[in-house]
Curated annotation (Swiss-Prot):
The gene is fmt. One of its GO terms (cellular component) is cytosol. (6S)-5,6,7,8-tetrahydrofolate binds at residues 110-113. Belongs to the Fmt family. This is Methionyl-tRNA formyltransferase. InterPro entries: Fmt, Formyl_trans_C, Formyl_trans_C_sf, Formyl_transf_N, Formyl_transf_N_sf, Formyl_transferase-like_C_sf, GART_AS, Met-tRNA-FMT_C. It comes from Streptococcus uberis (strain ATCC BAA-854 / 0140J). Attaches a formyl group to the free amino group of methionyl-tRNA(fMet). The formyl group appears to play a dual role in the initiator identity of N-formylmethionyl-tRNA by promoting its recognition by IF2 and preventing the misappropriation of this tRNA by the elongation apparatus.
Length: 311
């Protein structure tokens, strides 16, 4: 039985962890995840999805703010694990930890060498990619630059967003890891080096990237909105107040970018630099998320053709 330490934090990671737990070939010695955080308006302390899974299965949990130089690091190294598996962990592993195990692999949510970094699924959608995927790779000191053990892809559909793609890729990554790890550990599956010249990067989304620019094409705005749903959520401004947009459609239409060019009882069409967008699910400042129909029947009843978003 291969003794493993698992490292990760979000739901994506938890799905991969469950796959390892359910496989009798592996013994989970410990889980390393981010500390519990205060979330939401009420600032309730919440544990990570990975911690929840670990506690359900009575697996010891370590939660260092930063693994390198921590007391937890020494405890983790003393466990005498065969290897480490990470998935969306978000920290570099110290060299001495990597040197202390026989193997260390990462489940990364992109088709490397494209989209190294912390937000690969967001960028795949924002950039209008037609497919996304996962790569099982060896861990090295450079971010997501290790040799590739296996890759798998899946189409990005028109109704996909970050949430749906996270779910799809978590399952894809889990299954690919379970399928290929035995052959990798036995030496039958040889890793392949990445072409570093083709590497692209996906740093964490900034607040400036969340802001919609209606001079862009309708298709680009559509991709930006779904590439930030359900987090961090794209936004614009209306009458000087922040206005979040969860869903919209790219359609035909002409007008000045940001201008309302059509309004009915259940639709609101806004012009872009090329084409137009039909708003579907929105969230005015300080209000809950709602359909555009509910918005127009209430808070947005006074919006008229000729008004502008983005101001």
């Amino acid at each position: 039985m291969t003794k493993i330490i698992f490292m990760g934090t979000p739901d994506f990671s938890a799905t991969v962890l469950k796959g390892l737990i359910e496989n009798p070939s592996y013994q989970l010695l410990a889980v390393v995840t981010q500390p519990d955080r205060a979330v939401g308006r009420k600032k309730e302390i919440k544990m990570s999805p990975v911690k929840e899974v670990a506690l359900e299965h009575h697996i010891p949990v370590y939660q260092p703010e930063k693994l390198s130089g921590s007391q937890e690091l020494e405890s983790i190294m003393s466990l005498d694990a065969d290897g480490i598996v990470t998935a969306a962990f978000g920290q570099f592993l110290p060299t001495k930890l990597l040197d202390s195990v026989t193997f260390a692999v990462n489940v990364h949510a992109s088709l490397l060498p494209k989209y190294r970094g912390g937000a690969p699924i967001h960028y795949a959608l924002i950039n209008g990619e037609e497919e996304a995927g996962v790569t099982i790779m060896e861990m090295v000191k450079e971010m997501d630059a290790g040799d590739m053990i296996a890759k798998a892809s899946t189409p990005i559909l028109e109704d996909d967003n970050v949430g749906t793609m996270f779910d799809k890729l978590a399952i894809l990554g889990r299954d690919l890891l379970i399928k290929t790890l035995p052959d990798y550990l036995s030496g039958q599956l040889k890793p392949v080096a990445q072409n570093h010249a083709e590497a692209t990067f996906s740093p964490n989304i900034t607040s400036e990237q969340e802001k919609l620019d209606f001079t862009k094409s309708a298709r680009a705005i559509f991709n930006q909105v779904r590439g930030m749903n359900p987090w961090p959520i794209a936004h614009t401004y209306f009458n000087g107040e922040r206005f979040k947009i969860y869903e919209l459609l790219a359609i035909e239409g002409q007008g000045a970018p940001g201008q309302v060019i059509e309004k009915t009882k259940d639709s609101l069409i806004v012009a872009t630099g090329s084409g137009a967008v039909s708003l579907r699910v929105v969230q005015p400042s300080g209000k809950p998320k709602m359909t555009i129909k509910d918005y127009l029947n209430g808070l947005g009843r006074d919006i008229k053709v000729g008004d502008y978003f983005g101001q």
